[in-house]
């Protein structure tokens, strides 16, 4: 992976793609999925330690857009979940991302769910995970991203600790927000991960309104103290029925959140029913999520009528996939699974195809 990143930085994208497809990916896919993820993160951290940061400014393809009051170098970002602890923001930034979303982090470190908890559905270019917000805690993330060289936009995705009662969830989100506020260009409130017990119930309009009111009141207090208002986005599930989706969208807009991210992973297995791994519990992402997430974006866009922007994520493997989500109503898009299946070169490939 480190060699692939270096080749991309030197402009050898074709060679990098071949190296990933024929050497690196087969080697990684021989390993357990979570072990491969850990090895990838180690390689990206090593790439960062080698000083690739000096090349970051000229490695971010420029196609600027303003969203949430922030100037994004381009529309393509890294979705939350890959660099949970912000350990390799500079190295991922070197790939060309206009923004990077780290996390999900919680107030206190937690181990997440028992292993195995990450599965590749290779024939469907998809992934099932039931990680359970494993992370080193919000303070650790802040330490990791302090002093970063990456010049794009940094988002920090926050959540509730598994041991926190649902009725106290607002305290966790507010605590996380306070911890990461100075380090974040924007913050994402994750209320849609299917792998944390009870979390998705927070998307219900009756629960979401008091939660967001608490979080956004805390944001406004911090903004007054620090003289900088950090935008807050809310990440939602693709599994909400249309009425519930629209009700959640109304609450998000009315409470004063700055964007909605559509979508998180799905618990549906309709698109992968023939795969023997489809019976594994967890959230499904990747190509199998593409149509479901795009439809959610289309519904949200028609309902919100540009009141707040939409960030689209789910199954983007090409510039055409990204364009489809933008045409459905997304202002920005994020990728995750395609980076695993196609390698680091996918970033600049998508950006080139988008142009």
Give the label of every model feature segment.
Residues 41, 45-47, 52-58, 194-207, ...:
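Glycine/Thr-rich beta-alpha phosphate-binding loop at enzyme active sites
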Residues 103-152:
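A gly/proline- and charged-residue-enriched helix-loop-helix capping module
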Residues 110-125, 270-282, 338-355:
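C-terminal helical cap(s) of enzyme catalytic domains, especially alpha/beta-barrels
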Residues 15-66, 129-134, 138:
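An N-cap/entry alpha-helix motif that binds or orients negatively charged groups
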């Amino acid at each position: 992976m480190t060699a692939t990143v270096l080749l991309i930085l030197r402009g050898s994208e074709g060679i990098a793609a071949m190296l990933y497809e024929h050497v690196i990916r087969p080697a990684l896919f021989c390993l357990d999925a979570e072990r491969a993820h850990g090895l990838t993160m180690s390689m990206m951290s090593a790439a960062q330690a080698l000083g690739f940061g000096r090349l970051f400014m000229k490695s971010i393809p420029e196609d600027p857009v303003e969203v949430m009051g922030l100037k994004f170098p381009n529309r393509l970002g890294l979705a939350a979940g890959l660099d949970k602890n912000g350990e390799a923001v500079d190295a991922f930034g070197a790939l060309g991302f206009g923004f990077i979303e780290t996390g999900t982090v919680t107030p206190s470190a937690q181990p997440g769910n028992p292993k195995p908890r990450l599965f590749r559905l290779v024939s469907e270019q998809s992934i099932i995970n039931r990680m359970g917000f494993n992370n080193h805690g919000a303070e650790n993330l802040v330490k990791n991203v302090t002093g970063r060289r990456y010049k794009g936009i940094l988002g920090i995705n926050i959540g509730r600790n598994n041991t926190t009662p649902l009725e106290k969830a607002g305290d966790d989100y507010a605590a996380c927000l306070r911890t990461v506020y100075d380090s974040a260009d924007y913050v994402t409130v994750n209320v849609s991960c299917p792998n944390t017990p009870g979390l998705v119930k927070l998307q219900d309009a009756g629960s979401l309104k008091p939660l967001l009111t608490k979080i956004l009141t805390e944001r406004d207090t911090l903004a007054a103290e620090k003289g900088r208002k950090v935008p807050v986005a809310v990440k939602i599930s693709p599994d909400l029925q249309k009425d519930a989706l629209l009700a959640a969208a109304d609450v998000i807009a009315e409470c004063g959140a700055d964007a909605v991210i559509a979508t998180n992973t799905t618990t549906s297995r309709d698109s992968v029913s023939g795969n023997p791994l489809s019976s594994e519990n967890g959230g499904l992402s990747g190509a199998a999520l593409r149509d479901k997430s795009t439809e959610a974006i289309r519904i949200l866009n028609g309902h919100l009528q540009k009141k707040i922007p939409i960030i689209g994520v789910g199954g983007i493997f090409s510039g055409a996939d990204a364009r489809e989500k933008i045409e459905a109503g997304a202002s920005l898009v994020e990728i995750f699974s395609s980076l695993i299946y196609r390698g680091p070169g996918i970033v600049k490939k998508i950006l080139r195809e988008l142009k």
